[in-house]
Amino acid sequence: MKHSKKTYDSFQDELEDYIKVQKARGLEPKTCFRKMKGDYLETCGYKGEVNSRPTYRMFDQRLPSETIQTYPRSCNIPQTVENRLPQWLPAHDSRLRLDSLSYCQFTRDCFSEKPVPLNFNQQEYICGSHGVEHRVYKHFSSDNSTSTHQASHKQIHQKRKRHPEEGREKSEEERSKHKRKKSCEEIDLDKHKSIQRKKTEVEIETVHVSTEKLKNRKEKKSRDVVSKKEERKRTKKKKEQGQERTEEEMLWDQSILGF
């Protein structure tokens, strides 16, 4: 029997077609593939306990009725296991534990003997379920990769957004530093100017004082010279007057006194 492969536009269409085909064959496929994967591992003996009964029913549908009838010893397990369970467990938990243990014993008995060959429909169902599960896993992994890529892109965008703000803050800090430096330089310049002004004022005052002193000295010298000249003139006049009197006196003395 040849199977023609169909092409589908999307994964959802392929899944719906697969479900229709399996229902037409009398099978009920499960669409929750992650749970199916756990059930498959449990049937292969990777897990020691089974938490619910639907997996047992699904496995029961996959195996032919002859395989279940050929292992009657597995039916006597619940009574022996139930006697071994502790008395403090609740009724519901003990029932679940009993079902899980009986199912594990059943699967061990089934797979310890000669393996039962599956027919074509069962093999196709298992392969198809694993193929669909693989596609679902790829679909979810691609979604996860796109979400991580979007998150990383968002982080990069936020970092880029943060960088201009940091640049603005840095520029504002640099401006404030520059203003402070400029104000300090201006203060220093004002101080230097005031010091220079005071120095120049002092120098000007000293120069003025020195010039006045020189002027006073010159004036004093000129006065001294004038006074000396006048004194000389006076003394000269006095001398001249003294000499004239003496001659008169001499004549007077000669005439009267007879000297």
From Swiss-Prot:
Residue spans of biased composition, Basic residues class: 151-162
Keyword Coiled coil set for record: yes
Region span, Disordered: 141-259
Coiled coil: 169-249
Keywords linked to the UniProt accession: Coiled coil
Biased segments, Basic and acidic residues type: 163-176, 183-214, 221-233
Name of the protein described by the UniProt record: Lysine-rich coiled-coil protein 1
Organism: Homo sapiens
Native organism taxonomy: Eukaryota, Metazoa, Chordata, Craniata, Vertebrata
This protein's encoding gene: KRCC1
